[in-house]
UniProtKB/Swiss-Prot annotation:
Keywords: Eye lens protein, Repeat. GO terms for molecular function: structural constituent of eye lens. It comes from the Eukaryota. Residues 113-118 are annotated as: Connecting peptide. The keyword RNA-binding does not apply. The lineage of its organism: Eukaryota, Metazoa, Chordata, Craniata, Vertebrata. GO terms for biological process: lens development in camera-type eye; visual perception. This is Beta-crystallin A4. Pfam families: Crystall. Residues 1-25 are annotated as: N-terminal arm.
């Protein structure tokens, strides 16, 4: 898709779109031991802390429906892990692509607006939606290979759907989940990407599967 980062975005296709949450239910089952062993608990809504259930951490899980984001610490803090439909028999199944694996997952919540078929994101060179910009509606394992200069993104506006940005190409490194129903889709600075964000470095981006 050569030239996809070179055009400007008109006001009618810009930041005025409303986010539509995907219809459906969310269900996740977690265990306190690897291999789906030990104590088990099922959720259909957010869990701010598995510690309150007597779990030290989640060590295996199955996502039965919907998309979820897991967090290293209670209260939706720390590293983020995208959890799409499927089985995760051990912690490295959800943290295998990160360069900074953490053997803890203690809170999680649904990604309500994930919509793989209708996802659109504008990336900006500088914070506060300044500088060069480009519009994305597909998965990009390397932004630089698609024409984006440098290895940083200053700010984002999520028009629709939910996205996961990664620090390095190939969806590696820290993950940052961006949703159209959080911050009104506006992420003006890396401080709004998550409590673990320390840099503007983003080199791959993909849509979250519902």
């Amino acid at each position: 898709m050569s030239g996809m980062f070179s055009g400007s975005i008109s006001e009618t296709s810009g930041m005025s779109l409303q986010c539509t949450k995907s219809a459906g239910h969310w269900k996740i089952v977690v265990w306190d031991e690897e291999g789906f062993q030990g104590r088990r608990h099922e959720f259909t809504a957010e869990c701010p802390s598995v510690l309150e259930l007597g779990f030290e951490t989640v060590r295996s899980l199955k996502v039965l429906s919907g998309a979820w984001v897991g967090f290293e610490h209670a209260g939706f803090q720390g590293q983020q892990y995208v959890l799409e439909r499927g089985e995760y028999p051990s912690w490295d199944a959800w943290s295998g692509n990160t360069s900074y694996p953490a053997e803890r997952l203690t809170s999680f919540r649904p990604v309500a607006c994930a919509n793989h078929r209708d996802s659109r994101l504008t990336i900006f060179e500088q914070e506060n939606f300044l500088g060069r910009k480009g519009e994305l509606s597909d998965d990009y394992p390397s932004l630089q290979a698609m024409g984006w200069d440098g290895n940083e993104v200053g700010s984002f506006h999520v028009h629709s759907g939910a996205w996961v940005c990664s620090q390095f190409p190939g969806y590696r490194g820290f993950q940052y989940v961006l949703e159209c129903d959080h911050h009104s889709g506006d992420y003006k600075h890396f401080r709004e990407w998550g409590s673990h964000a320390q840099t503007f470095q983003v080199q791959s981006i993909r849509r979250i599967q519902q």
